[in-house]
A protein has these predicted regions:
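Active-site scaffold of zinc-dependent metalloenzymes
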Residues: 2-3, 7-55, 70-89
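General N-terminal targeting signals
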Residues: 38, 63-65, 77-78, 95
Length: 100
């Protein structure tokens, strides 16, 4: 088990497919902080680089989950949505808990 997770996280897509979310080091030749393998495939999974900071990890997690649900969307739309949602969640919930 890695340092960022006590258990395996999973999501269930619209078509009830269970997809594991795995936090581990991603090979640098991938040039990615996260990867979503085709959610329609037998080996579907989401990888998130466990070396990321909290805020970046949140945004990448949102982005890869969005890919799993809306795999056909172009990358720029997924990134825009993920960045906006990540910003709102971070500022509303995570940043405020730091201030307390």
């Amino acid at each position: 088990m890695n340092k960022n997770s006590d258990k395996t996280l999973n999501i269930k897509t619209f078509f009830d497919k269970k997809i594991p979310i795995i936090f581990e080091e991603i090979d640098e030749k991938e040039v990615a902080d996260g990867l979503c393998y085709n959610p329609y495939s037998k080996d579907a999974k989401i990888l998130i680089d466990n070396r990321l900071g909290k805020r970046r990890r949140l945004n990448v997690l949102i982005e890869e989950i969005t890919h799993a649900f809306f795999y056909e969307l172009p990358e720029y739309k997924v990134r825009k949505f993920s960045a906006e949602l990540g910003r709102v969640l971070y500022n509303q919930f995570l940043k405020k808990t730091k201030e307390k």
